[in-house]
Amino acid sequence: MDSLDAEQLSALQKAFDSFDTDSKGFITPETVGVILRMMGVKISEKNLQEVISETDEDGSGELEFEEFVELAAKFLIEEDEEALKAELREAFRVYDRGGNGYITTDVLKEILRELDNRLTEEDLDSIIEEVDEDGSGTLDFNEFMQMMNG
């Protein structure tokens, strides 16, 4: 549960509670599918059953809140990563002025200066040296992603 923020946990608790109408402390696998689909998760029935059986630690056939959160977290985190990748791809596209599939290290320096104006020229050169492993003077999208993801 560490990987979810308070807002996400609260939303999951509300969804769980609204489907646990008898306050029994668990929801059925069918309900899990409904909740995930309401959250915008696209999952086949087969994949849903596989994920539920992996998560249903006590083998009860139902999911307690903690199990439900563990299951939902997999999808929420995955979606966050996909959204981040899409945003980074768009940022890369904007800076790839020639549409060549790469940005120059000079453009990268501009980006880094915009992100942190306290970076010295030495700092920038050090960063460039680290991320431009092949010394080409350019970064393709994968190199850019590696740098942005730390």
Curated annotation (Swiss-Prot):
Disulfide bonds: none
An annotated GO cellular component: myosin II complex
Keyword line: Acetylation, Calcium, Metal-binding, Muscle protein, Repeat
Pfam families on file: EF-hand_7
SUPFAM superfamilies reported for this sequence: EF-hand
Domain EF-hand: 7-42, 43-78, 83-118, 119-150
PANTHER family, alphabetized: MYOSIN LIGHT CHAIN 1, 3, TROPONIN C-LIKE ISOFORM X1
Misc: There are three different troponin C in lobster.
Protein name (Swiss-Prot/TrEMBL): Troponin C, isoform 2B
Organism: Homarus americanus (American lobster)
